[in-house]
């Protein structure tokens, strides 16, 4: 009985179909293809924008055009701001140059006319000296005093000349309202019309600036 069972089992093993080599080799390949497909689907799910870009070139071109337009708008805005800043810089530079020029002119004028205040204060003193020197006397002591007065007067004039103070020429010159102040008119002959015929008070100028115009009589 036991021997019959063994024979039956042996027959069953012989009747089983063997697994083909081709089927065994194709199973791993199918599994690899399936895994690659699942991986591609997963990447497409994680990056739908890339998938859509690959799938739709027209949409990608539209996005690039929009980005380019934005970049151009930003460049135009920056160029406009740069131009405005350049204008502001030029205005500030011009204002600064004007300030420097005015400051330089003021400094030069202050140096050039530094004696103006003192000279103006001394003009009445010069007038008094001139009046004193016009006095005529036969007294020797008075003449000696007048000689001393004249020396002081000349020294004072020399000091003022060194600072640029000059006497304005008047008699015989054409009347100039910038240099002369007409206080009288005369019909005296021998002079061209509108000519200074007499100086009543001397005028002075400091370089090219008038300290005091000369008071004169003018022919008609």
Curated annotation (Swiss-Prot):
Keyword Chaperone recorded: yes
GO CC annotation: cytoplasm
Disulfide bridges in this chain: none
Location within or outside the cell: Cytoplasm
Coiled coil: none
Ranges of compositional bias, category Polar residues: 1-12, 50-63
GO BP: protein folding
Tree of life domain: Bacteria
Region (Disordered): 1-67
InterPro entries tied to this protein: GrpE (IPR000740), GrpE_coiled_coil (IPR013805), GrpE_head (IPR009012)
Main location (coarse class): cytoplasm
GO MF assignments: adenyl-nucleotide exchange factor activity; protein homodimerization activity; protein-folding chaperone binding; unfolded protein binding
PROSITE patterns noted in UniProt: GRPE
Alphabetized UniProt keyword annotations: Chaperone, Cytoplasm, Stress response
TM region(s), chain numbering: none
Keyword Transmembrane helix: no
Reported function: Participates actively in the response to hyperosmotic and heat shock by preventing the aggregation of stress-denatured proteins, in association with DnaK and GrpE. It is the nucleotide exchange factor for DnaK and may function as a thermosensor. Unfolded proteins bind initially to DnaJ; upon interaction with the DnaJ-bound protein, DnaK hydrolyzes its bound ATP, resulting in the formation of a stable complex. GrpE releases ADP from DnaK; ATP binding to DnaK triggers the release of the substrate protein, thus completing the reaction cycle.
Family as reported in the entry's similarity comment: Belongs to the GrpE family.
Record's subunit section: Homodimer.
Name of the protein described by the UniProt record: Protein GrpE
Organism of this sequence: Geobacillus thermodenitrificans (strain NG80-2)
Gene assigned in the entry: grpE
